[in-house]
Amino acid sequence: MVVDPYQKREAKRYKNPIPSREYISSCLRTSQDLISQKNLEKKFGINNQESKKALRRRLRAMERDGQVIYTSNRCYVAPESLKIVKGKVIGHRDGYGFLRTETLKEDLWLSSEQMKSCIHGDIILAHIVETHGKRRSSARFLKLLQPNNILIVGRYYIDDKIKFVIPDDTRFNFKIFIFSAIKDDISIGSIVSVKLKQHPIRNSRVQGFIVEILGKEMGTNLAIEIALRTHLIPSLWSKEVKKQVYEISRKINQYDFKNRTDLRHFPFFTIDDEDARDFDDAVFCKRKANPEEGWILWVAIADVSCYVQPNTPLDKAALERGTSVYFPSLVIPMLPEKISTDLCSLKPNVERLCLICEMSLSKQGELISYKHYEGIICSHGRFTYNEIFKIWNGDIFLRSKYKKFLKDIENLSCLQNIFNKDNISKKGIYFENIEPKFVLDSNLRIKSIYQNIRNDAHKFIESCMILANVASARFVEKYKYPVLFRNHDRPKKDNVVSLRLFLNELGFTLLGGDSPESVHYSNLLKNVSDRPEYEMIQTVLLRSMTQAVYSPDNRGHFGLSLSSYVHFTSPIRRYPDLILHRVIKYLLFKDKNTSKSNYNFYSAHLYSTGEIKKIGAHCSITERRADEANRDVIDWLKCDFMYKKIGCILNGVISNVTTFGFFVRLNQFFIDGLVHINSLNDDYYYFDSLGLKLIGKSTKNTYCLGDALKVKVISVNLNEKKIELSLYKSS
């Protein structure tokens, strides 16, 4: 007889435990027939009325969550048996949508007819409708499990006395009819936030009411406000959080020194961008007593866990945010400024509590051993990447200005020269991405754009942080306790096949068989680095990759070519790093068998697998939403900037090719605009998905990734964040 594997867990939770959800689902999946509750009771040996009622409640809860289906003949069945899946609706601007599930590799297609019963962001149950040939399978809406209850931002209009809002997010492809407003004299065209009162039901209107009037004239600040509401990003602190922060002392007392290693005499430096807002890491290195034996590298990370303790209002607020959100003109921090820009900011000449990762490196820069401990440091200097790079390259003024630090700065340079040759951070896939930087004017509009060039100082700090993350992963992995790993899965097989076909068209080969390793991708990039196709190949390689996620299951990091990886170095701005610090502290104190009275026990914490899994899924989502919110604001800023360039003739390179045209990246501004296929009137063009190009049916003229073109800016739609271009041909 099979025993419920979660029996002990249920016994801890309930006085009279019944079979777990997982066990019930397993029994239904393996059953050949539909099963009634009565037969389930017999199968599980449930006889008393109290347990029968508990089982009924559990089955209803499972039905509500889409884990079981209750049929018309009063039986239960697993959704998989009926090809029924639970998923999240992803809307599309053209009215159709997709259903994203946790179990299927590919999203299911939702027709515009099916989308009349749901909206973007809904969690639904749907029936899989198989299709033949190359088309993807579709989904038929069955039941709304969890409606998307977010506030929808859009513009307010009146037409023939009918009030409605058109959503700013085009994935909501419908009008919201307003039956009541917070006031009657709202100006037409005002940007408002709306709460839905009635979800779409076939052939019925979506209804809602206005919650807030955000403004009328668009600007950077309003674009940020819209992004925050669209992506449900909290930006205010509760009274409880403010109270807790107020009570935190700014002074380090003698108790804080207990069991900490005093490193204040070590010349730690912070090295960041000119416009950096967080200073949560500092580095110091020196040669070993015998230089032939290598180096010792110290990475000091602000001890956020000392101030943000588990399950406090501050901790809950940080978890809800998951990450800091960086807009061009503003930061929405994960932690209040008293912590993020003061107590945990490693400012020069100020004592700060840190968690230290001390690493022993070989002469070749390889990680030999490591140790973690609580420390206290005093940063000796705040440098920028450009300053360090210039000092390394002999800048007379800076070398004179920082004369007393030259020996230690030169040590950093020596270690970077070793890193440049070969070390753990060089074994992964390295993409040379173009990173545009915006200079804003007094109105927070783009004044100018320049390319941010990564120099050796950037690469050095990146290598130091990767090493500290690897050392931390190796440390926690030894104990087998639940932690959040940073997983980057290998590319999906379909993506590898498509990539190989594309490369074959160009005459290049990706080695590694069915499952190429990171080294094969890296070698390919090195082999084509001096070829004109480099940018194009790098773009396609990058698009073939999966997204990195947080999970308690260690699956390794494909991009970095590492068997295990965690995030340790940014607890000010990333919640997973804060969790890792707490677990590391727990393991340190557990090893020392130290009594609670001898250290700050409340900054250490161990999590259950269930807690870690839930937090990992949440933090993966908050990371994506932060990226999307930032992208929304940057796209608006770009469109606002390009609005003044309508009519201009500019040079660019094709950055993406689709069925409806191709995008051109403007060389001068690093901004993409669309050349629509309908504007190519010299021929009928079709999309070649294999070679990622458009081909003229008669002329055989082609437009493919990397082609250099001259284009004209035709129009800019600020509301839809679209830039339209056309090919420019001189007369």
Curated annotation (Swiss-Prot):
Ranges for domain S1 motif: 647-728
Leading EC class: hydrolase
Keyword match Cytoplasm: yes
Keywords per UniProt: Cytoplasm, Exonuclease, Hydrolase, Nuclease, RNA-binding
Subcellular location: Cytoplasm
Catalytic activity: Exonucleolytic cleavage in the 3'- to 5'-direction to yield nucleoside 5'-phosphates
Entry GO MF terms: exoribonuclease II activity; RNA binding
Similarity remark: Belongs to the RNR ribonuclease family. RNase R subfamily.
Described function: 3'-5' exoribonuclease that releases 5'-nucleoside monophosphates and is involved in maturation of structured RNAs.
Protein name: Ribonuclease R
Source organism (scientific name): Buchnera aphidicola subsp. Acyrthosiphon pisum (strain APS) (Acyrthosiphon pisum symbiotic bacterium)
Gene name of the encoded protein: rnr
